[in-house]
């Protein structure tokens, strides 16, 4: 059985594109970086009113409603938050947590912390 060079080239390009997509998707779903917290009461990007007492967070691209486990890298404390807003808009930050979520993982005083996060649903 023989294949035309153009068919082989197309298969290679499509195969490479699909592997790049899966790698970038995996990278976007879990990671580590700096998180901050906020306690505004304005409307979020999802349309709901921000409630600092709820376990919510902002992320630049995760779907609204996504549940994410966030762990403070310094003390190992974790919290599960629901993505309901967009942000953070400060370079180098990966998440903006509600005040309640920040309190649960012990980062109120510092205002920001290194965290690792993982999508759980």
Residue positions per predicted region:
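Secreted/periplasmic proteins
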Residues: 2-121
């Amino acid at each position: 059985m023989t294949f035309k060079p153009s068919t082989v080239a197309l298969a290679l390009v499509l195969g490479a594109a699909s592997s790049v997509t899966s790698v970038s998707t995996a990278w976007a779903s879990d990671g580590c970086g700096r998180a901050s917290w906020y306690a505004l009461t304005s409307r979020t990007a999802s349309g709901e009113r921000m409630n600092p007492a709820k376990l919510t967070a902002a992320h630049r691209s995760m779907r609204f409603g996504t549940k994410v486990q966030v762990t403070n890298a310094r003390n190992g404390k974790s919290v599960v938050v629901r993505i309901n807003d967009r942000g953070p808009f400060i370079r180098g930050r990966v998440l903006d947590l509600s005040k309640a979520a920040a309190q649960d993982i012990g980062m109120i005083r510092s205002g920001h912390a290194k965290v690792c996060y993982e999508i759980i649903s």
